[in-house]
UniProtKB/Swiss-Prot annotation:
Modification type 4-hydroxyproline: residues: 2
Localization in the cell: Secreted
Tissue expression: Expressed by the skin glands.
Function: Produces in vitro relaxation of rat arterial smooth muscle and constriction of intestinal smooth muscle. May target bradykinin receptors (BDKRB).
Entry protein name: [Val1,Hyp2,Thr6]-bradykinyl-Gln
Primary residence: secreted
GO cellular component, one term: extracellular region
Source species: Pithecopus hypochondrialis
Family the UniProt entry places it in: Belongs to the bradykinin-related peptide family.
KW Secreted (keyword) present: yes
GO BP: defense response; vasodilation
Molecular-function annotations in GO: toxin activity
UniProt keyword annotations, A-Z: Amphibian defense peptide, G-protein coupled receptor impairing toxin, Hydroxylation, Secreted, Toxin, Vasoactive, Vasodilator
Length: 10
């Protein structure tokens, strides 16, 4: 997971 990437925010 890249820094700053949030899979929870869509």
């Amino acid at each position: 997971v890249p820094p700053g990437f949030t899979p929870f925010r869509q």
